[in-house]
Amino acid sequence: MHNLLENLRRRLLAQRTPEPLPPTSQGLARPSHDVVRGPCDADIPPDARNTMPEGITVEEALAVAELPQKHALDILATAQAIRSVHKGGPAALCGIVNAKSGRCPEDCAFCAQSSHHATGSPVHALLDAETLLRRAEELRQSGAERYGIVTSGTRLTVRELDTLCEAAVRIRRETGIALCGSLGQLTPDAAACLKEAGFSSYHHNLETSRSFFPAICSTHAYDDDIATVRAARAAGLRTCSGGIFGMGETDAQRIELSATLRELDVDSIPVNLLSPIPGTPLQHRPTMPPMRALVSIAIYRLMHPARDILVCGGREATLGPWQSWIFLAGANGMMVGNYLTTTGRDMADDLAMLATLGVRA
């Protein structure tokens, strides 16, 4: 093993992760701010967050990224060792519903739902409470702990937000599944409403680094997305924010995004891999080489030893038969079921894979 990797491995393994809060009769402990948590690193007591293990520096991450290809397996092995110590519990699983689809005024180059692109993406208004409840129960029975309600558009209207919060109260009461909102840009007042309705987490991807963002989106500012993550965190919501790999960014820009996520102290990092969609500006972009994608995931684990890292959209197209390697690369969870506008892998196949790996019963 390269000396750099061995030194990083020893340093990260020597650190300790704070013990999670103990279970309660309701299934999970509740911190003093009464946010319902999933089986994730947000179960760490708030006063222990400052003692979370420190990841490698940006300079060290760049050095790892520059190692020759012959060291790729050693990079994965290093990340897997860190995952097994700091995030070695059962794989975290989340699922989503496309609760409002299409006609988005943003021009994100990767997105099928943008009104700027001719993709033939489904278009529908906000789903009713019964449909949202049915999808929640399906995911809960399949083993997902967290249910993401995702809507297209810059942000919800006040009426849509009220409707969704009313549905959330019922979903929490009847299924018990942890709720995550992915509803676009968020004001502090909207974040407070979501928390009161029973949402425990808010998802809002930065998508890419600040330096590469102008090549991906021109209809809103990078700081708008950062403000949303901060508003969610200030409201007591668990924050979930990551990006998409393979849009043409460099290794350094993926590391730049990782550093920004660390500055924001996000709880969970979803990693998506570009699946080029016909009709979008990135439709002809080749998929990322599988090993490069895995090494990039591994670097994120080294930078975030004790945070949740979930691999989500695009894993089928980019990784193919190497999908199970995401755990060898340091991920500790994944999205299951279908995505927003593309079909995911059969749930039974994913659960069988997890059982074979020993990361899920």
From Swiss-Prot:
It catalyses: (4R,5S)-dethiobiotin + (sulfur carrier)-SH + 2 reduced [2Fe-2S]-[ferredoxin] + 2 S-adenosyl-L-methionine = (sulfur carrier)-H + biotin + 2 5'-deoxyadenosine + 2 L-methionine + 2 oxidized [2Fe-2S]-[ferredoxin]. Signal peptide: none annotated. Binds 1 [4Fe-4S] cluster. The cluster is coordinated with 3 cysteines and an exchangeable S-adenosyl-L-methionine. Belongs to the radical SAM superfamily. Biotin synthase family. Pfam families: BATS (PF06968), Radical_SAM (PF04055). The keyword Heme does not apply. It comes from Nitratidesulfovibrio vulgaris (strain DP4). The gene is bioB. Keywords: 2Fe-2S, 4Fe-4S, Biotin biosynthesis, Iron, Iron-sulfur, Metal-binding, S-adenosyl-L-methionine, Transferase. The lineage of its organism: Bacteria, Pseudomonadati, Thermodesulfobacteriota, Desulfovibrionia, Desulfovibrionales. Pathway: Cofactor biosynthesis; biotin biosynthesis; biotin from 7,8-diaminononanoate: step 2/2. It is an enzyme of class 2 (transferase). GO terms for molecular function: 2 iron, 2 sulfur cluster binding; 4 iron, 4 sulfur cluster binding; biotin synthase activity; iron ion binding. SUPFAM superfamilies: Radical SAM enzymes. This is Biotin synthase. Its EC number is 2.8.1.6. GO terms for biological process: biotin biosynthetic process. Residues 86-315 form the Radical SAM core domain. [2Fe-2S] cluster binds at residues 180, 240. Homodimer. Residues 14-38 are annotated as: Disordered.
